[in-house]
Amino acid sequence: MSSAASNVAAAGSGVRGDSGPGRRPPASPGGPPRSPRVVRSASGAVSVAAALVIWLALLGPVITLLMHISPGAARTALTSPGALEPLVVSVESGAVTLAVLLVLGTPLAWLLARGRLPFPRVWEAGLLLVLLLPPLVIGLLLVFMVGPFTPVGHGLEALHLSASNTFLALVIAQVYESAPYYVLGAMAAIGSVDPRLEQQAALLGDRPRRVLRRVTLPLAGPGLAMALAVAWARAMGAFGAVIIVAYHPYGLPLQIWTTLQETGLDSALPFAVVLLVVALPLPLAAYVWSARAQRRRRG
């Protein structure tokens, strides 16, 4: 009996020893198991490589532009008579466009973000429709809406204005192409502000305008700046609607197009660089400000 009991105990201890913490797990049929750290490092390397490829592909046009531009051709193009007039036209029309968006787009974004308008989905659908319309289609629709042979066009003529091949037409085209970007971005920025903060300020006696000025706009400021910067870049590059309703006066996009058609690619590249220099600093500055504001909130 004692020998049988000892044999059973030895067998039991052997079974427990195979599955206990002191024993290694059996090897997988395909070989030794991979360490989770190795798997994570391999997947991380693949992710970084894929991200780098995508990043280089996105920046490829800009890098190619800088590599192919000739200093001599740039000097000749930018110093030719009237070469800087498109830059002035683009900056002036872009500034007016931003002013219109700030004055008209910000209240609309606030009303939509706070649900103060009836049928908010209809308003948002309208903004998305304008956002998704091809720019050339926007230009055609503007001709039928504010052209010289429309009721709006006749009303503008009575005021000695015109929405065809004028500075006003250029601003209208830029507003229509950039407004959805600003209003939708401003909606998201204002919607991220906690309404309870506005309610607390109102309970303390602040009027709605003061609440908007002292609470809502400062908290939504980075997001509003980012939306405005995107609208600026969109207005600076507006071409499809502009070429139909405002072929004159020339802005930078039309200058690039006409130079490309008349004298070739080498002469158009310097104006493309000027357009990038004018259009990109504001979005980059807004991005840096927004990132810093987010870090301050988290910290």
Predicted segments with their positions:
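Membrane-water interface segments at the C-terminal ends of transmembrane alpha-helices
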Residues: 38-72, 81-191, 215, 219-235, ...
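Short glycine/proline-centered loop/turn elements that form peptide/ligand docking sites
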Residues: 193-197
